[in-house]
């Protein structure tokens, strides 16, 4: 193992391992800022068609470097190797722009762990994509992810200032973060009964019939009443866009399932994708959908304990676990139950990470 600044060991990461995508880099950046451990990542996004750093990943690197005063090499578009050596995290007011439709929500999620464990509040503005494929949409962040983070202690106020769809981008989100010294441990095993399901067709600068067809298809699959569906039209975006969002409210949790409109894909297919995912979640007894399950791993590891149930565990999540283990003395125990997977943290030091 190489030696990094401040006498700390340089963690070396193979970016081609597991699912080999951008989450490996984002998790490493988050944990490097929190723990102070430097890292080098090689073969960045090796399993993607366009490997190396894209604009979204580069923005996350530069944002993390600014917040933590890091020394960085390899921070350029297309780079497949990066070294990141953080100094001290400085909370405050920050503004970052992806410059494309690359995900603003993923950039924000990269920065959150360090800022929610800082010694002062922060205000972060990120411009880019707010509703695009292969990333959590703003609604998921605000209604599904943020409430769980707040139950761990930090205060997190999220505002959607402007929509950003692929390919125009131009969206804007603001996060107001009040940190805590240490995160509370959570046991997210039982979601309770399903109380309600709603479908929202989001439409920007596109014909209404698209939304009508999506809602009709979703209603047929999920058995939704007319009062449980609505069209949300917006002109507050730089370009056209469409998404169908299914909101599943349970006694203790809300999940959002989203599918995005795309040229060449029928409105019916878009609706089917979101509705089937929602139906699979409802049919399980899991607290978390597979996407939330991946995003719970890091905060639970930082809290030093906790567990949750998920619809299923993915290669994405298993890869994330391996990266977390490089920075923290933890491991996760995964067991299959009747119609869900149970994930629990095990660690040699259950004290957790504090500021």
Curated annotation (Swiss-Prot):
Function summary: Catalyzes the conversion of 3'-phosphate to a 2',3'-cyclic phosphodiester at the end of RNA. The mechanism of action of the enzyme occurs in 3 steps: (A) adenylation of the enzyme by ATP; (B) transfer of adenylate to an RNA-N3'P to produce RNA-N3'PP5'A; (C) and attack of the adjacent 2'-hydroxyl on the 3'-phosphorus in the diester linkage to produce the cyclic end product. The biological role of this enzyme is unknown but it is likely to function in some aspects of cellular RNA processing.
Entry binding sites for ATP: 109, 291-295
A GO molecular-function annotation: ATP binding
Keyword annotations of the record: ATP-binding, Cytoplasm, Ligase, Nucleotide-binding
Class in the EC hierarchy, top level: ligase
Localisation per UniProt entry: Cytoplasm
InterPro entries tied to this protein: RNA3'-term_phos_cycl_insert, RNA3'_phos_cyclase_dom, RNA3'_phos_cyclase_dom_sf, RNA3'_term_phos_cyc, RNA3'_term_phos_cyc_type_1, RNA3'P_cycl/enolpyr_Trfase_a/b, RPTC_insert
Xref: SUPFAM superfamilies: EPT/RTPC-like, RNA 3'-terminal phosphate cyclase, RPTC, insert domain
Protein name as catalogued: RNA 3'-terminal phosphate cyclase
């Amino acid at each position: 193992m190489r030696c990094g600044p401040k006498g700390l060991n340089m963690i070396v990461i193979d970016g081609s391992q597991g699912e080999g995508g951008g989450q490996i880099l984002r998790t490493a950046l988050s944990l490097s800022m929190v723990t102070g451990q430097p890292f080098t990542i090689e073969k960045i996004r090796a399993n993607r068609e366009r490997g190396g750093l894209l604009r979204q990943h580069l923005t996350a690197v530069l944002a993390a470097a600014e917040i933590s005063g890091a020394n960085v090499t390899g921070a350029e578009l297309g780079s497949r190797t990066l070294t990141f050596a953080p100094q001290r995290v400085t909370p405050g007011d920050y503004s970052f722009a992806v410059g494309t439709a690359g995900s603003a929500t993923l950039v924000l999620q990269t920065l959150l762990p360090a800022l929610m464990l800082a010694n002062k509040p922060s205000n972060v503005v990120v411009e880019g994509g707010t509703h695009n494929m292969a990333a959590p949409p703003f609604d998921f962040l605000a209604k599904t992810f943020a409430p769980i983070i707040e139950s761990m202690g930090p205060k997190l106020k999220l505002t959607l200032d402007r929509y950003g769809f692929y390919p125009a981008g131009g969206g804007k989100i603001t996060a107001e973060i009040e940190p805590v010294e240490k995160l509370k441990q959570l046991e997210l095993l039982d979601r309770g009964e399903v109380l309600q399901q709603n479908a929202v067709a989001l439409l920007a600068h596109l014909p209404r019939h698209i939304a009508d067809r999506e809602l009709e298809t979703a209603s047929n699959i999920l058995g939704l009443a007319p009062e449980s569906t609505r069209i949300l039209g917006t002109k507050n975006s730089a370009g056209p866009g469409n998404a169908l969002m299914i909101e599943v409210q349970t006694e203790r949790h809300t999940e959002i399932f989203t599918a995005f409109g795309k040229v060449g894909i029928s409105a019916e297919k878009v609706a089917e994708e979101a509705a089937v995912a929602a139906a699979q979640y409802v049919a399980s007894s899991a607290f978390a959908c597979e996407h939330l399950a991946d995003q719970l791993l890091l905060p639970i590891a930082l809290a030093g304990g906790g567990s949750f149930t998920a619809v299923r565990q993915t290669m994405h999540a298993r890869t994330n676990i391996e990266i977390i283990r490089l920075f923290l003395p933890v491991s996760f125990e995964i067991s299959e139950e009747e119609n869900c997977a149970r994930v629990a943290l095990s660690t040699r030091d259950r004290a957790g990470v504090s500021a």
